[in-house]
């Protein structure tokens, strides 16, 4: 994540890379995906929930910081605040991972991402939206 944010790419490319990194990680680690969505191990639920929350908070913070930096240097004001943009990105990621787990790992979280990205990008960056 830090490598993505440190790159000289546009915020659009960074956001796409961030989303694809997380989706690919969950795709390659289905057991972790299941755990992060609340399927606890026996006796682990009380300890697991705060750790999962902390992990998602860290992902959101990294995304939000990158979006804030990008907006501070952007010429056009995006249609959403960095907080709203981050919420949208995380909801899309969590939704794709939920679908993956619910399908018993048959429907990849990266399936159709390349086709969906242009629409996501417009929603995140289109100043005329």
Where are these regions (language model features)?
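Non-membrane alpha-helical structural segments and their capping/turn regions in soluble enzymes
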Residues: 12, 16, 53, 57-60, ...
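Amphipathic alpha-helical packing segments from all-alpha helical-bundle domains
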Residues: 28, 46-73, 83-87
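Hydrophobic alpha-helical connector segments
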Residues: 1-31, 82-89
């Amino acid at each position: 994540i830090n490598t993505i944010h440190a790159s000289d790419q546009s915020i659009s490319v960074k956001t796409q890379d961030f989303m694809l990194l997380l989706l690919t990680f969950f795709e390659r680690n289905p057991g972790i995906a299941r755990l992060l969505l609340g399927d606890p191990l026996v006796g682990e639920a009380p300890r697991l929930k705060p750790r999962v929350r902390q992990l998602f908070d860290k992902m959101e913070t990294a995304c939000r910081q990158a979006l804030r930096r990008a907006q501070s240097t952007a010429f056009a004001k995006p249609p959403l605040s960095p907080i709203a943009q981050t919420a949208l990105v995380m909801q899309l990621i969590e939704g794709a991972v939920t679908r993956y787990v619910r399908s018993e790992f048959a429907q990849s979280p990266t399936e159709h991402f390349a086709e969906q990205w242009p629409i996501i990008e417009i929603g995140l960056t289109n100043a005329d939206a």
